[in-house]
């Protein structure tokens, strides 16, 4: 496995390759990331991973400065699993050698809802860096996790509408034994918070169970779930029941007709903001 830090070195190593599979990350890798790399290896060769903490997708009061930078540990994990051929680990100057005045803006009806409402500009930052990384790597396939459900949809729609020659593959959310979705930010949790954290996923499962039990009002499903979290001390940003196909709210007819849905939630446990989702 090789590690490169410049776009030129990246392109030199990939010259002539036309089956590249790509996994973009911000580093601080866990088993969820490594699962994406295993899926990438099934769909392309060589596998390229990027490690870059992208300032553009962090808001002014978010955790850009304290986000863990763990490149040596990340490299060791990838070397252990032997799924990755090339790691692209640029610094900020390499990715943004001048002010990034040209940016990729997702449509308001997808980019400004849910995560976009509570993290203004987040998806513009995501789309811009993903577009740049795809231009650098030029993969045939790229793999994203379903844990970031809205991000997956934004990126997939961007690539389709801009006719980028890349297939976006999705990997199911990887979870700990108690159901907590693996996340680089889980390390911020105290011992007591870590014990409480699986409740977020349990709450989403409760939404699916109530719908299966006959509840057809999405607002009622959202309200009960959000209140249950708040009663346990969570600070809830949103609990939303949406259509899987476009993240729009379902109407009553769609609820009764069995429309495929997804429940999405974001809430703070102490100082740590967690997100999760469940298709049903």
UniProtKB/Swiss-Prot annotation:
Pathways involved: Cofactor biosynthesis; (R)-pantothenate biosynthesis; (R)-pantothenate from (R)-pantoate and beta-alanine: step 1/1
UniProtKB keywords: ATP-binding, Cytoplasm, Ligase, Nucleotide-binding, Pantothenate biosynthesis
Active site annotation, chain numbering: 33 (proton donor)
Binding site for (R)-pantoate: 57, 151
A GO term for molecular function: pantoate-beta-alanine ligase activity
Residues the entry annotates as binding beta-alanine: 57
Binding site for ATP: 26-33, 145-148, 174, 182-185
rRNA-binding listed as a keyword: no
Tree of life domain: Bacteria
Miscellaneous comment text of the record: The reaction proceeds by a bi uni uni bi ping pong mechanism.
Subunit description: Homodimer.
Biological role: Catalyzes the condensation of pantoate with beta-alanine in an ATP-dependent reaction via a pantoyl-adenylate intermediate.
Family recorded in the similarity comment: Belongs to the pantothenate synthetase family.
Name of the protein described by the UniProt record: Pantothenate synthetase
